[in-house]
Design a protein with these regions (language model features):
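C-terminal segments
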Residues: 1-187
């Protein structure tokens, strides 16, 4: 973790994120029908490109997640704020975009892929995506339009590239690995 010990986001790195109990997905975010007005245009295009490949539940969950991420961006992550409140100096807390390589292993759910990539795109980070399987044409086009570099790489090729990245000691580069839900689920 790169958070400052005792800092505002420190505890986030010490825990884990788990899904909440099943909710009524039909009623999720009924007030957000116009995603184009709520989401960054690039994120909205990613959602539009993938939603036809999702069932109703996954489509609703992804929509809910993208709206929640947009609200969190606007309220906390997308703006600098002085959390100290000192009158004689400014101590701005800012979240800065960091380059990220996202690896979607074979069987990665498309909603999971879009959620992670959309967060990076919204944050203004340089996002590079490595996928084991070819993406649907609409999604590949939306990713390209959002400025995401996409490479289709076999597992061995990805492993070699990851080893090269690790040995290069590229400062500030993050790697996010996604896989099939049944392999990554927390029990």
């Amino acid at each position: 973790s790169t958070t400052k010990a005792g800092g505002p986001s420190y505890l986030l790195g010490l825990g884990e994120v788990v899904p909440t109990a099943d909710r009524n997905h039909e009623d999720a975010y009924q007030g957000h029908h116009d995603l184009a007005a709520t989401l960054d245009a690039r994120v909205s295009a990613l959602y539009d490109a993938v939603r036809t490949h999702l069932d109703r539940r996954d489509m609703t969950e992804l929509r809910r997640a993208l709206v929640a991420d947009a609200e969190a961006w606007e309220a906390q992550y997308g703006t600098g704020r002085d959390v100290t409140g000192l009158a004689w100096e400014r101590n701005l807390l800012r979240y800065r975009p960091t380059p990220v390589v996202v690896r979607a292993a074979g069987g990665t759910h498309p909603a999971d892929l879009v959620r992670v990539v959309a967060a990076g795109v919204r944050a203004g980070a340089f996002v590079s995506l490595s996928v084991a399987d070819r993406l649907p044409t609409e999604l590949a086009g939306a990713l390209a339009a959002a400025g995401v570099d996409v490479d289709v790489e076999a597992p061995g090729v990805w492993s070699a590239r990851l080893a090269d990245l690790a040995s290069s000691k590229a400062l500030g580069l993050r790697v996010r690995v996604l896989g099939p839900r049944e392999e990554t689920a927390v029990s």
